[in-house]
Amino acid sequence: MNPAHLLVLLAVCVSLLGAANIPPQPLNLLQFKNMIQCAGSRLWVAYVKYGCYCGPGGTGTPLDQLDRCCQTHDHCYDNAKKFGNCIPYFKTYEYTCNKPDLTCTDAKGSCARNVCDCDRAAAICFAAAPYNLANFGINKETHCQ
């Protein structure tokens, strides 16, 4: 084999090894983001670091109604995980958006439908809850005990 080809092959292998360390992104986050946009007027990024429960993880007492929406969403995902091999963060689903109405269309009782119902309920809850800017980007270690 030509030494130049070996170098190219080596470079490809090394870059693939680096890519293997990149964590996979949840597949349904795009769907959840779109549901949030359908149900309400705030951008989805407004919820990423809000309160004690919005965004990754969650602990302590929710700070307000919006934070309770996120806590309820977390618990809903926990319940969805109990049905067979259901991994909510990676499960895609079918739904329709007729602003501001959301309809989940997968078969009732399926993993996809359970996850969709969780995201739908959260998006509707987000749209109805007041937004307290003081709860965005808080220090969870001091405020969420």
Curated annotation (Swiss-Prot):
Asked if the keyword Ribonucleoprotein belongs to this entry, the reply reads no
Q: Which family does it belong to?
A: Belongs to the phospholipase A2 family. Group I subfamily. D49 sub-subfamily.
Please share the entry's free-text remark on the cofactor. Binds 1 Ca(2+) ion.
Record function comment: Snake venom phospholipase A2 (PLA2) that inhibits neuromuscular transmission by blocking acetylcholine release from the nerve termini. PLA2 catalyzes the calcium-dependent hydrolysis of the 2-acyl groups in 3-sn-phosphoglycerides.
This protein is called what?
Basic phospholipase A2 1
Q: Where is the signal peptide?
A: 1-19
Domain of life of the native organism: Eukaryota
Q: What is its main location?
A: secreted
Tell me the GO molecular function terms.
Answer: calcium ion binding; calcium-dependent phospholipase A2 activity; phospholipid binding; signaling receptor binding; toxin activity
SUPFAM superfamilies per UniProt: Phospholipase A2, PLA2
Please state what class of enzyme this protein is.
hydrolase
Which residues does the record annotate as propeptide?
20-27
Q: Where is this protein localized, as stated in its record?
A: Secreted
Q: What is its EC number?
A: 3.1.1.4
Q: Which GO terms describe its biological process?
A: arachidonate secretion; fatty acid biosynthetic process; lipid catabolic process; phospholipid metabolic process; positive regulation of fibroblast proliferation
The record lists Ca(2+) as bound by: 53, 55, 57, 74
- The active site annotation covers 73, 119
Q: Which organism is it from?
A: Bungarus fasciatus
For this chain, the annotated S-S bridges are: 38-97, 52-144, 54-70, 69-125, 76-118, 86-111, 104-116
